[in-house]
């Protein structure tokens, strides 16, 4: 049985004793970071923010097996944030521009409601129009077929996880978004962790 096949599967529970120390470390690190930033001038804060966003985009892309040119990402982020560029400007691909667009919207407009349409727009940005002919997937919409996490050679595959059936995805995402946008549930590292796990379990998009 996969998690989404259980009754009330989104009623997540966790062991507070096992995560309390980690959560405290995260909150202390956040406090330290905000304290350091507050000591910087406005321009230095922008530069620090640009470097942080650049590093996150590059490292997140590597997790997905995508290697981006750090200088190209930095140039795109700096231009969007109005940070003076150092050295020769890098040429910026559509791939980089799309990923930067998604990252900046997510990090700078985090107080805006997360909607189906916003997620569709993010998915569109990740697959530039000039390269879509290379992808045999649904883009800018929820997937219309099954999704599995599989390893192994062809004919000897091992299914590690099977996501909810495609016809369930819109309703599952509606439940998820209602929870995510609930103002009575305060933003926190724990909420972010639950949201990440929940979203991955649904796996609503092709990739």
PLM feature spans:
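FIC/Doc superfamily catalytic core
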Residues: 1-207
């Amino acid at each position: 049985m996969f998690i989404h096949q259980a009754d009330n599967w989104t009623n997540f529970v966790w062991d507070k004793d096992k995560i309390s120390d980690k959560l405290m470390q995260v909150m202390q690190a956040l406090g330290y970071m905000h304290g350091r930033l507050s000591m910087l001038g406005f321009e230095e804060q922008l530069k620090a923010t640009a470097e942080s966003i650049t590093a996150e985009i590059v490292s997140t892309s590597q997790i997905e097996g995508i290697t981006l040119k750090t200088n190209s990402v930095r140039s795109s982020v700096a231009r969007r944030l109005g940070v003076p560029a150092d050295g020769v400007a890098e040429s910026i691909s559509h791939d980089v521009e799309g990923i930067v667009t998604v990252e900046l919207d997510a990090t700078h407009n985090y107080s805006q409601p997360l909607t189906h349409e916003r997620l569709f727009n993010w998915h569109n940005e990740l697959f530039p129009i000039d390269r879509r002919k290379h992808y045999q997937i649904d883009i800018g919409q929820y997937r219309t077929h099954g999704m599995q996490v599989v390893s192994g050679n062809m004919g000897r595959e091992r299914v590690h996880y099977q996501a909810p059936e495609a016809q369930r995805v819109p309703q599952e995402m509606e439940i998820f978004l209602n929870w995510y946008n609930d103002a009575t549930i305060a933003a926190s590292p724990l909420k972010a962790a639950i949201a990440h796990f929940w979203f991955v379990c649904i796996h609503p998009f092709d990739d």
